[in-house]
């Protein structure tokens, strides 16, 4: 079955890691391709392009910035081809299965991480088998469980999603999103990340290999997707040390960190060894009003 994995990014410079992960996890087993659009593009144009590809399956990665547009897009696609199978996945759909199945013109929702279950779903569709997969729901068969967390060593065994040949030509024009861990140690009630339990880390050997290979491209900005890069001090220090020793002139790394739990060892290491203009940090405050922080379980020490 010809399958397209796609999404609407907020800007052209943003590059969807999720599409590339699903692609490398399925391309050796199914006729799968991916493409990206932006929220600024005309939906009729996108519809016509997707229909012209003659896909049998279209899978969307859904986020807060594109969910309403994807709702419209799904209706347009189904109007053009009622037989088209539409799958939604991503953080925005994972916790409201009923809402999306009841209000969107779609066929399936994947809840949770998709690298394993997306392939399993395509297997079933290809072979016309009954679908009984944890984390996969249809209008008639709803599974409110999340898919099982993916063993990160499995992802490490796949072709690198960061270094696909098709991406090499415009590496300098787009932000490269990179993950060294999954999960979040915090419980902030306003954030979907708080629903994931525990932290999992990619192996240092894998991360070092990816960073080393990326330094041989002309990428300019590498933004880490880790929810709190400094959640585990030893891990953060190991990554920083490798970056400092192997970086290329003209590249910048951007991190999201929690300032109130920033270990002094990290501060000292950056002050002593960080090359100029190599690092950028996002430090979330959210609120300085303590009663609000307590209600939403955003614990921070000012």
Region spans (language model):
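A structural micro-motif
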Residues: 1, 30, 84-85, 250-251, ...
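Mobile, glycine- and charge-enriched loop segments
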Residues: 15-36, 75, 170-176, 181, ...
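Radical SAM [4Fe-4S] cluster-binding motif and immediate context
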Residues: 159-302
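Residue-level recognition of beta-strand->loop/alpha-helix junctions
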Residues: 7, 34-38, 61, 195, ...
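A short, flexible N-terminal coil/short beta segment enriched in small residues
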Residues: 1-17
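Alpha-helical structural signal in soluble globular domains
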Residues: 25-29, 76-80, 103-104, 124, ...
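Glycine-rich beta-alpha loop elements in corrinoid/cobalamin-binding modules
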Residues: 2, 18, 25-26, 33-149
